[in-house]
Amino acid sequence: MGGEELSEFEKQRLANIAERDALLKKLTQDAQSVGLFPPKMPKGASPAGDKAKKKKPAPKKVKKEEAAAAAPVPRRMSSRLRGIAAESEVAKRKADEHDAALQEAERAKRMRKSDSFSLSEMLVSGQKLSGESLLGVDVVTKGVAMPYQRTFSDEDIKKTTDKDLKALREEMSGLGLWDAWEPNRIKLTPERIYAMTFHPSESKPLIFAGDKMGHLGVLDASQTKPVSAATHDEDEEDDDDDPDPVLTTLKPHTRTISCMTIHPSKPTHLYTASYDSSIREMDLEKTTSVERYAPASTADDVPISGLDMALDDPHCLYWTTLDGEFGRYDMRTPRQDSATRWTLSDKKIGGFSLYPTHPHYFATASLDRTMRLWDLRKLSHKSPVAVGEHESRLSVSHAAFNGAGQVATSSYDDSLKIYDFGAKGIASWKPGHSLSDAQMKPDVVVRHNCQTGRWVTILRPQWQQNPQSHIQRFCIGNMNRFVDIYSGSGDQLAQLGGDGITAVPAVAVFHRSKNWVAGGTASGKICLWM
């Protein structure tokens, strides 16, 4: 760059540097002349005035401990460079392995078991069963439960003008809570009750309840409190003399028992359906349980939401799933040959039932907000078409048929709807018959709080299949901690309650023919009115 001519910028920069150096040199000379600081001394020279050298201080003695501490230490090196895994990584790996093991254990616990079970293999707690012992109106405020506040009372009965209706109201309202034990002491299942049924026997009330984790509870309500306990009821300090009722808890399923039924012609067999994708048959005489239907692979997850059987056929099972399927299976033939399935909805079917006297008709309730009526005689697998459908404002929880051809539904739009297909001539319809939207409108709509929330089982109507009078009636749980009973025309017949009911008896069921009503709660406890 020596031969190159400097630019104007470079010339100016060099001039500034030279000017700054000259200024600094002048300032230094001026400061020395007035004695602000002495001039620099040659290396090794002492100031002129310091003739005597200063005495050096004696070297400080260093203790052995300090010397050891001052010794050179090994150079720090990271665990990564030394080939050692970091503690956080080891802990994370152990935590991941632990979580994976827990998930696998939970998956295995929830996977259905296809084996046949004996009583000892199913028994969780309580008394061992034997075949001999086994057989022998309106909620005004939407979404707000008002515990113990009645919406139907004796005043409503007194105001009734219809003689038959008044007599039935008096009869149903006269049902009393089973007083041998308070409801909060009758814990039939460990977890929340999802399904219940009575044994069809009229000799004694025998109740079955299924819970969230696949437990099956059994209660014989013909038992009486021991005399020793009855005489000590008033002695609060002597709890040992007041035993709980005799209950039995079994575990035939690994997941929620969603539905159960006993065919009247086979009273010794209880059928249970579960979210573990299986339907099992429990022989009440032999106290054994066998799998009657399930998908081919245990890895297939097809939760079953409903189960029913035709009155004239004790060999055929009908069910619905949370995937929107409807199935039929004849237990006398191999499952792979006779199990038939239809996809009836894109969303889950929460409940269904067959028309008892004409079981080729059935009604479904779906999350897609519809209640649909179907005819098995004209049900295509490729594109099934319903006889008719009615759409509610919100999802429909259940659709229950009675022997008179009426369907009762419960819906999240806070209503109970009754569709009277019997009055429309359903018994004489030919295959292919269809109903218009106008014909599918409900005949009766009753306001009812159905906002169960997360912890209460969904409210579902359940008819008495063989009522003792010509008036049809069904029961359903009430969020105010009652069980309501309605007639087929929508008239409220009773509101059953009592002392000691501390939770909503959400799962309510009628005995087939006797005026016995049971209600199950989220804590696994039951109430019984007789």
Curated annotation (Swiss-Prot):
MF terms per GO, please? DNA binding
Q: Which GO terms describe its biological process?
A: DNA damage response; regulation of DNA damage checkpoint
Can you tell me where the transmembrane regions are? none
- Keywords attached to this entry: DNA damage, DNA-binding, Repeat, WD repeat
Q: Which PROSITE patterns match?
A: WD_REPEATS_2, WD_REPEATS_REGION
- Ranges of biased composition (kind: Basic residues): 52-62
What the protein does comes down to: DNA-binding protein that binds to both single- and double-stranded DNA. Binds preferentially to UV-damaged DNA. May be involved in DNA-metabolic processes.
Protein name listed in UniProt: DNA damage-binding protein cmr1
> Which organism is the protein's source?
Aspergillus terreus (strain NIH 2624 / FGSC A1156)
